[in-house]
């Protein structure tokens, strides 16, 4: 998907805005699981979630390409905090579209980060359709939830984990839109590790199926990994 040099470039962008987050092998988790268990604390990022890494890389690269017009995206929360945080750093305006009834705390955070927030529709798909329509009407750039530069940024968290913890037997990664697990696989492969990467999704895999449709619509292919 990208090269080691591109990952190094992404790392420089991320670390200009935030330090690496910690990872710890917690004794109580070892007692509960019967094995050494590490936790990567992405709650220590400026927005409390790993997705800000991808937003930082994408928005900086947009600015470097001279793409300085406003951006818009659809989200229920973490992606919607990532984009305005990163956009504000490079002087680009951002608009976020979320469903009606979205978390008030997430909405407040997105507004506080400088986004224009539009609440419409009753699910993510409706919000995304509205965001794409607004993008056309206003001449804004629509940012999908998954893309090369977003994944490049996200890969930095897995790269930090593997460099600190070494070759783990397995890593469990939650699946939403897929950037986290794809970034983890990329980091593992770049470091030449044999760690098993296991995706964890909701029962019924509704989010996973939606993720696969989004990847195919974006022009990519879904990675083959186990779902538990």
Segment roles from a protein language model:
Residues 1-228:
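PLP-dependent amino-acid enzyme catalytic core
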């Amino acid at each position: 998907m990208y090269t080691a040099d591109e990952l190094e470039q992404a790392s420089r962008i991320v670390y200009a805005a935030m330090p690496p987050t910690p990872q710890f092998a917690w004794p109580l988790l070892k007692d509960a699981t019967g094995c050494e268990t590490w936790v990567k604390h992405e709650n220590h990022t400026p927005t409390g979630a790993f997705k800000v890494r991808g937003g930082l890389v994408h928005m900086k690269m947009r600015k470097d390409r001279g793409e300085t017009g406003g951006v818009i995206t659809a989200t229920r929360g973490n992606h919607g905090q990532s984009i305005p945080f990163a956009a504000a750093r490079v002087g680009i305006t951002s608009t976020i579209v979320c469903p009606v009834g979205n978390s008030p705390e997430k909405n407040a955070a997105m507004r506080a980060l400088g986004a224009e927030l539009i609440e419409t529709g009753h699910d993510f798909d409706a919000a995304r359709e509205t965001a794409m329509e607004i993008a056309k009407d206003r001449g804004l750039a629509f940012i999908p939830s998954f893309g090369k530069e977003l994944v490049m940024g996200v890969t930095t968290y897995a790269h930090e984990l593997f460099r600190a913890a070494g070759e783990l037997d397995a890593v469990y990664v939650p699946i939403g839109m897929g950037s986290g697990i794809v970034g983890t696989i990329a980091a593992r492969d770049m470091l030449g590790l044999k760690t098993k990467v296991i995706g964890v999704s909701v029962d019924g895999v509704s989010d996973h199926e939606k993720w696969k449709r989004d990847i195919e619509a974006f022009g990519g292919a879904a990675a083959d990994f186990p779902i538990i």
